[in-house]
């Protein structure tokens, strides 16, 4: 027996997920009217769709900027899609802005994904962990497993795609991208980003006030 689904519920699900009306109705019927289960069903189907699109070439897009802290921190990020049509859509531009804000909120993030992290960085992290005192009395096999777990955690701290989304901590940036791939129907990729901090790399002059006064008095 097919459960009766109201048009209002279908509309609410469509607004929540951006899926098509018929897809929303079908998901609600499959889940016996359970709204949250229907959301998860559509999300899973969307992620499958996103995975198929991820191999497609994305050469269009936008470069988005975000300035924070009264002009003391700036972010530039390049977000790519497949067509200029999608690049001009408000949803895509909002996504780019949110990603730029995410980068501003994550000062430890230096790479887009863990596979981008150079091997020398990984080896350095491994050496640091292997030499920690709390592992001195551990058997070699156990020690290596603990070190591997710590390294993976550290690498994720450096990776943008592994960060919890600042607007919804229940999802990662990787999941946010996949959801938007499903919503907009094109492959979307974060190609690169750059962080600018005011005065970074410059040595700030710190004058000794007493010395300055003495110099003035002796002139």
Curated annotation (Swiss-Prot):
Intracellular or extracellular location(s): Plastid, Chloroplast
Signal peptide span: none
GO molecular function, one term: translation elongation factor activity
Keyword Cell wall biogenesis/degradation: no
Family assignment from sequence similarity: Belongs to the EF-Ts family.
Function: Associates with the EF-Tu.GDP complex and induces the exchange of GDP to GTP. It remains bound to the aminoacyl-tRNA.EF-Tu.GTP complex up to the GTP hydrolysis stage on the ribosome.
Identification of the protein by name: Elongation factor Ts, chloroplastic
Organism: Guillardia theta (Cryptophyte)
Gene: tsf
